[in-house]
Amino acid sequence: MAEEEHVSAVESGPLADQYRLSLENRIIHAWLKPPSARLGIDCRVEVTQVPGGEVVGARVTQCNGDASVRQSIENAVYRASPLPEPPDPALFHRTFVFEFKPQ
């Protein structure tokens, strides 16, 4: 039970927020914006990684951008590999979904 409480506390705490932000920033900085990209892009991306952060899968599941934008986002995830390691092992998830909203 203590293990579950630790995982729950870590996943809802500031370390989790910091880790999510580092993942999102790494991917957004790897993004090569296609000519068809417009302001207000909002996409959900499913990422699969292995321990060590190597990306083995990336798929845009929902997006208000066209096919070119979707493909560019998936490519950015692969370019961002390896992803940053979490500050606590409890934060590692083989598959996670994040919201891609570049400014």
Regions found by a protein language model. Give the residues of each.
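Compositionally biased, low-complexity segments enriched in charged/polar and small residues
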Residues: 1-71, 75-79, 86-95, 100-103
